[in-house]
Amino acid sequence: MTDSSIHQNPSAVSTDGPSLPPRRPPRRTRRSVLIIDAIANWTITIGGLGVILAVFGIMVFLAEVVWPLFSGSHVIAQSQARLEGAASDVLTEIVDEYRTIVVSVERNGEVTINHLATGRLIKTRKFEIGERKVTAFARTLNGESVAIGFDDGSLRLGRIKIETAILKPSDVPGGLTELGRGDRTDSEAVYSAIEGDQVRRIAVSVDLDEPQPIAPEGTALVALDFRLGGAAERPTRSFVSIDASGAIRLSRLETKRSLLGGISGKATVNSTDLPALPAGTQVASILMTSLADQAYVVDRAGTMIRYDTRATQKPSLAERTRITPEGVGVTTLGFLVGEESIVVGGADGSVNVYFRLQRSGSDTADGFVLVKTHELERHAGEVVAFGASPR
């Protein structure tokens, strides 16, 4: 077949080979898809930048919060107020969590409530102690529970309840007396205006349990410490005491309570005598842990005597060590929160912190020793008291 014949008869061309697919018209992306895609891109970009800025903002905030820890401290403001009706022999003082009132417990059993900012007297209450003389006193860390030892060898446990209530302005009684700084009183409680168009009422009540004989009758208690424990239905109150003869006792008072409320049965006291103190010991202070497994006695010369009372039926004198330099007496003693740190204040103005640590090869009865772990800046005068925050 010649070329001319092909042109003359196109149907003669073979069609047995593969054929090309038909050409399709070009596609165009819809405008709505392009708009959505652009919005998604911008959203992701802006969101990513926002996350980065948020992280940097958190870093700046944390740096601002932490920086004061490294920049030292300074006093922003301070104020002083003389407490009206305050006695010279105060056993302890308690400030409420809002720093509105201060409660003072005096040796004669009176409990005075003052406005903290101005010192004005709000109310005077009283523990009814009769003719007994207070010779020893202890309180829990938050100050709500107290133990009072007397000259006849008895002990009474009490409570100081700082009660807070939030009121509507319409529930506030009339005729209140202005105290200053936005506080008012009706001579029973303090009323403070707070946010949300509300008023906070703070009042104090006290009560005292019946006396419990601890030492032989007529032998005064000279040192005391007190802790709370146990379960709600069977609360326990443990205390360690030293009487005028030098005898030291670990006691536990247990009361049965009904789950439906009220007290069932009579409070019972179980006491254990601890090994006698060395002859001539002049006790400055005494401490006990909440578990009643350790007791610490400090004499006025600066020697600490530690008792291991984990086995209550067989307590031991575990350690005797000096915690102040020779010739320097101990003026204050107490626990920090957790009862692992013991703060010791000295007549030379020193403030040191001790821990009870386990050490192999120690010559103590239980393998633990008291170790000075922190030495704080010395004060100009002797340290006579300190207060630990409950938080």
Language-model-detected regions and their locations in the chain:
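Transmembrane alpha-helical segments of polytopic membrane transport and secretion proteins
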Residues: M1-I46, G72-E93, D209, V222-F226, ...
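Short coil/turn segments that connect the beta-strands within blades of beta-propeller domains
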Residues: Y98-T100, N142-E144, P235-R237, L291-D293, ...
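Conserved beta-strand element within WD40/beta-propeller blades
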Residues: I52, V102-E106, V146-G149, F239-D243, ...
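Short loop/turn segments immediately following beta-strands, especially the blade-tip
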Residues: P68, T118-G119, R159-G174, S251-S264, ...
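Short loop/turn segments immediately following the C-termini of beta-strands
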Residues: V55-V65, R107, D151, I160, ...
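Loop/turn residues immediately N-terminal
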Residues: N108-V111, D152-L155, S245-I248, D293, ...
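A short beta-strand motif characteristic of beta-propeller blades
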Residues: A77-G85, R120-F127, D209-A215, V269-L277, ...
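Canonical WD40 repeat/beta-propeller blade segments in eukaryotic WD-repeat proteins
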Residues: A87-I94, R132-A138, E217-A231, G280-M288, ...
